[in-house]
Every structure is written in structure tokens, then in C-alpha cells.
Amino acid sequence: MKNAIVKFSLTALAAFTLAACGSSGGSSDNTAAPSNEQKTQATPSKTNLPTQNSTKANQNQTFTGSAFVISEQDDKVQVKNVKFNNANINQLEVDGQTITLTYPGIYAGSWQRINNTAVCCGKYANVRMGVSLSKGPTEKDILFYNGAPTQNMPVTGLASYKGDSIILSDDIGDDSDEVVGQSSFDVNFGAKTLSGSITANNVPTINISANISGNSFEGTAKSTKLTDGAVEGKFYGNNALELGGLAKANDNSWGAGFVGKKQ
């Protein structure tokens, strides 16, 4: 996966868009948007659901997001999971590295690419997901998600989420080893279960199955052609309006990030 992410800096990042907001101007980095970019923002459900007491929901849910810090040693991919405890969607501190997620006067509703960092997406109010790429083979790549976790989790009812994803793998079988795509999830708050998928062009679908605990979820990530793995994530915003997370193969051969919004 390390080789895939290093290659990512030279290929897929060119597909991300950067939009300028207002009279402050934009960046000369602007490129064509991915064909799978979602053009509209879904309207959240207006159903009023019972909610968990915020203290109970967060007894052991103190982290706000996490990152995979990816390096290569002796031709083996090494992945370290780093937890965040700061609900900052503008900047992250990861393994001694500062990652800027937003810039004054610049807005990108879809993927935003500045320098070696790609972030998704301005259309989400409470969560960000993306990748910060190394500038050379001796540096580390960082795949991350973070945001403002839900304090009032629903305890009954069903919800569906749709959003964005990125998949990085040596086994995609395309000209590049990475691709942006979509995410789709169904949640049963009463049963505390989440199921869904991460999809992208030319990539075997990654099926997600997880159990919910508080405002977090953990489970499995499986595909017909990719190695099985694990998934983690959290719900963000009022009444679990949005979600985000990461998935990774058990043998580190692929990794993925995803975000979604309640429909």
C-alpha cells in the first residue's frame, strides 16, 4: 500500500478540484473534477428520534477521529493507527506533521488538493477525510478522518448515508493505484448495526459490516478480490447527521477512507 500511496502523489491528485470562494481568489492548482463527483448535497432526514444521553454515549468514545501513518521498512508496509482528541476540521497534528485542511477564502465542495494534501469535502459540515502524501520514499503517508463527534446519538430508527470515498491499492488493475469513489451505508440505531459498501471505478466493491458503540463503530471490510480487513469510524454532527471512517486490509495491501451524510 505504501507504493500505491507514493504513486498517488503523481497521478490521482491531479483529478481533484479546488474551488475559490468570493473575491479572495483561488489557486492555480485547479483541475477537472472526478467524473463521480456528487453534484448535490443530500437533505438530512427531519425525523425526530430519541437520543442517547451524551455522557453515556461518550463514556469510552473520547477520540474524535484517527489516521493511518504509513511507512515502509525492509520492503514491508508498516501502518500505525493514531487517534485524535481534537474536533478540528481545519488542521491536524499527526506524528509530528501539521496537515492544513482548510484555507481562508478557498472553498471546495468536493475534493480539494493543495500541495501534497487532498481533503474531502467542503459539503460536509462536521467531518473531513483525506490523505497527506510523503514527498519522498523516506517520508510517511497519512490517511485520516476527523471531526466533531455526535453527542446525541439516536437509539431507535433506521437511516441511510451516502457520500465519498478513496481507495488505495496495488491491486486495482488500472493505470493508477488509487481512485476516488462513493460510499453508501444503512444504519439500524436500535440494533446498533451498520452495513454498506465503498465503491469506485474498476475496484472490487468493499463491503462493510460493523457494530455501533456510543458514537463509534467497528467491524469488517470484505471484498471478492481484495484481502479482508477491518473498518472503524464515528458519527458526526447533531443526531448522527454525518459519518466518517477508515478501512484497511489485514495484510496492509489496501486502505480506504470514507465520509457520508444522512439522506
Please state what every model-predicted region is.
Residues 9-10, 221:
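Generic detector of short alpha-helix boundary/capping microenvironments
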Residues 18-20:
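C-terminal motif of bacterial Sec signal peptides marking the signal peptidase cleavage site
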Residues 1-9:
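Bacterial N-terminal signal peptides that target proteins for export
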Residues 22-263:
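Mature soluble binding/inhibitory domains
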